[in-house]
Every structure is written in structure tokens, then in C-alpha cells.
A protein has these predicted regions:
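An N-terminal-biased, well-structured beta-alpha scaffold segment characteristic
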Residues: 1-91, 193, 213-218
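Phosphate-coordination loops involved in phosphoryl transfer and adenosine-cofactor binding
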Residues: 3, 65, 142-145, 223
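Rossmann-like adenosine-cofactor binding region
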Residues: 56, 175-266
Length: 318
């Protein structure tokens, strides 16, 4: 009896392949602009394990595909609307990376506020000598009012970690969260006007495109701090670089960018920006857990008839 065929377009965490190879036939193909598959092979594919985009046109080439397991909590690269129309279940990897991303958000906030990377670079350059000291950091976390743009699973973990710092916490989402005591603002502009620190942790959707623009940055003000661990899609990078250069915004800490891995030169230049190469979930334990969830979703689908973590748009409800 032939094994179920799973398509893997491009690279994916090696642990996913290790978990699946003894149960399924792995059809690994290079990632290219188009999906070049022999018709016979395409007709045997019943599942996809993917890290990155998977457009609707590719789904149309796979008449028997049932489930697409996405490596990552964000799944904006997968055409879920088209998948739903075709009855294809899409899964992601929520929860297993919440702690890591939340920890990174706090670390990035502290590094940005206290200029810790610059202080370390100053020391490594041999500048710490008798009679010298690194200049006082302009900002402190003490007494800040932090606004969370997004209060999903990760946003809530960030908020929990902020509480011991004794900062005031507020948030903006599409609707108020029941059972949450933080102040709620129905608009992002209202939140930005009220706070001096904004942490963005929202997904890539048409509604979040460049919502953090010049107007929002101006509302945060010259003492304002922006931290983004969500999606670069949400920030107008030209407006941000201009605000950092002019002093209209105090500082920014970014783990994500609009067109990764490209980082605009105007963001590399300001000394009041702390930049990371999208590493919020990038630890061995967390990536292993994400890989396990990709594999477990596929195994559960074919052995029990239900995925573990289907996305909301999927034909199978969580």
C-alpha cells in the first residue's frame, strides 16, 4: 500500500521531516515562483508542510490536497480564503512560541529604552577607561505608559511580563476584551495619544497595513518608544525613519520589517533604533516545538480525521 504523499516546497525545519519521513512519502521540491510538479505526482499529494507562502494557484495544481500545515503562528503567506473555498484545512503553530516572543518583546523594549546595545559596543570599542563613563541613557522604563497594539495570546503574555515593571498598561484591539483590566482604547490614534510606549503585536491583514504611520508616531512624541514584534507590514518605514532622524520619535526597537530580509538604509543609520533580524521565536526549544506541532497536525489529520490547530478561516473549526 502506497504511503500518503506530503509536499514540502522549499526549506522547512529538519525536525518536521524527521517526524514525518517514516509515516509519509515526502515530496520535497525547491521553492520557485511556480510549482513545477509532474501531473502524476501532483495528483498524489494529499497534504502540504510549508514554511513561507503557498498561493491559491498552487492549491489548484493539487486536486487531492486536504490539509496545509504552516510552520509559524502567522499564516498570511497562505491563501486561506482560497483554501477554505476548496475545502482545504490550514493549520498554524500557535501558543508554543508565545513565551519566547513575549520575552523578546520585553528584552527589545529594555534594550531600546536603556541603549544597552550601544553601551556594549562602546565598551567593546575600548572606550571604558579610567575617568570615563558611558553617557546616561536618555530614557527609562520607570513611569512609562505602555500601549499594546494587539492583545491576542502573545499580547497577553507581554502584558503579564510588563506588570512587575510597574508601568501603566493600555491596549487597542478591534473590540474590548472581557475580563481584562487594562484600559481599552477603541482606536489606535486614541491609544497613541495616551501612551508614550507602543508595542505592536498584530498580524498582517489588509486592516493593519501601515497603520503605524506619521500621525501615530507624532502622537507618541519625542519621548515616545515604538517596539514591533508583530509584522513589518504594520509600520510605514519611511515615516518611522524620518521620525527617528528628526527626533519626532524618541527611539524604536524592531524585530520585523516590511520586506524581509531587506532593511531600509534609513533605518540602519539612526543610533536611536535597535534592530533584530526577526528572531523573536528563534530559539532551538521553541522552533523544535513549532516543528512538532506542524508534524502533529498532519499526523492527527490522517490518523484521527481532525487537525489540532486549524486557523479560524478553515473548514474545520478549532
Amino acid at each position: 500500500m502506497s504511503r500518503i504523499a506530503i509536499l514540502v516546497p522549499g526549506k522547512i525545519h529538519e525536525r518536521v521531516l524527521d517526524r514525518l519521513k517514516d509515516r509519509f512519502e515526502i515530496v520535497a521540491v525547491p521553492r520557485e515562483e511556480s510549482l513545477a510538479l509532474d501531473g502524476e505526482i501532483a495528483g498524489r499529494i494529499r497534504a502540504v508542510a510549508v514554511s513561507g507562502s503557498f498561493p491559491g494557484a498552487w492549491m489548484d495544481q493539487l486536486p487531492r490536497v486536504e490539509v496545509i500545515a504552516n510552520f509559524g503562528v502567522g499564516y498570511d503567506g497562505v491563501d486561506v480564503k482560497h483554501a477554505a473555498e476548496k475545502g482545504i484545512v490550514v493549520t498554524n503553530t500557535p501558543d508554543v512560541l508565545n513565551d519566547e516572543v513575549a520575552d523578546t518583546a520585553i528584552g527589545l523594549l529594555l534594550n531600546t529604552v536603556r541603549e544597552l546595545p550601544r553601551a556594549e559596543a562602546w565598551l567593546r570599542a575600548g572606550n571604558w577607561k579610567p575617568g570615563t563613563a558611558y553617557p546616561l541613557s536618555r530614557f527609562s522604563l520607570k513611569g512609562r505608559h505602555v500601549g499594546l497594539y494587539g492583545l491576542g495570546r502573545i499580547g497577553l503574555e507581554i502584558a503579564k511580563r510588563l506588570e512587575p515593571f510597574k508601568v501603566k498598561i493600555s491596549y487597542h484591539t478591534r473590540s474590548r476584551h472581557a475580563g481584562v483590566s487594562y484600559d481599552y482604547y477603541p482606536t489606535l490614534k486614541g491609544l497613541a495619544n495616551a501612551v508614550d510606549t507602543l508595542i505592536a503585536i498584530v498580524p498582517k491583514t489588509p486592516q493593519t497595513h501601515k497603520t503605524i504611520d506619521a500621525d501615530i508616531l507624532a502622537a507618541l512624541g519625542p519621548d515616545g518608544i515604538l517596539v514591533n514584534v508583530g509584522r513589518g507590514w504594520t509600520v510605514d518605514e519611511k515615516a518611522l525613519s524620518a521620525a527617528l532622524a528628526s527626533g519626532a520619535l524618541g527611539a524604536a526597537g524592531l524585530d520585523v520589517f516590511y520586506e524581509e530580509p531587506t532593511v531600509p538604509a534609513d533605518l540602519l543609520e539612526p543610533t536611536n533604533a535597535v534592530l533584530l533580524p526577526h528572531v523573536a521565536s528563534a530559539s532551538v526549544p521553541t522552533r523544535n516545538a513549532m516543528a512538532d506541532l506542524v508534524a502533529d497536525n498532519l499526523i492527527a489529520w490522517f490518523e484521527k480525521g481532525a487537525a489540532l490547530t486549524p486557523v479560524p478561516e478553515t473548514p474545520q473549526k478549532a
